[in-house]
Amino acid sequence: MFCSVSSLDAEVACVERADLVVCDLWDHESGHHSRPLARALAAGMITREDVVELPDLVAGRHPGRTSDDQRIFSTPVGLAIEDVAAAARVYRKAEELGLGTELSLWRNPIWT
């Protein structure tokens, strides 16, 4: 997964090579001409139909990644608190469906 969090941190070719392209909301993303999806659209590398909106993934209207080999390009925009809220919802849905893998990020956290 490649997550583009600013206007110029991704080459447009990353979008073209992705098997799944995800953004928060297409109308918001496509209006920012310096962002990777808008540049890929202008270059004819993708169409609107190639892009999945995050709400469609969360609501289950799009299956998302269908194999471990797929490359995902994600371009979240907005406030970090929105990302936390979306992540919490995705986590609860994955937990409900019995999906995902629990990761141990630290063996002995230094802050506890």
Could you say what each language-model-derived stretch is?
Residues 14-111:
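Adenosine-phosphate binding glycine-rich loop
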Residues 1-18:
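Aromatic-anchored, glycine/proline-accented short structural segments
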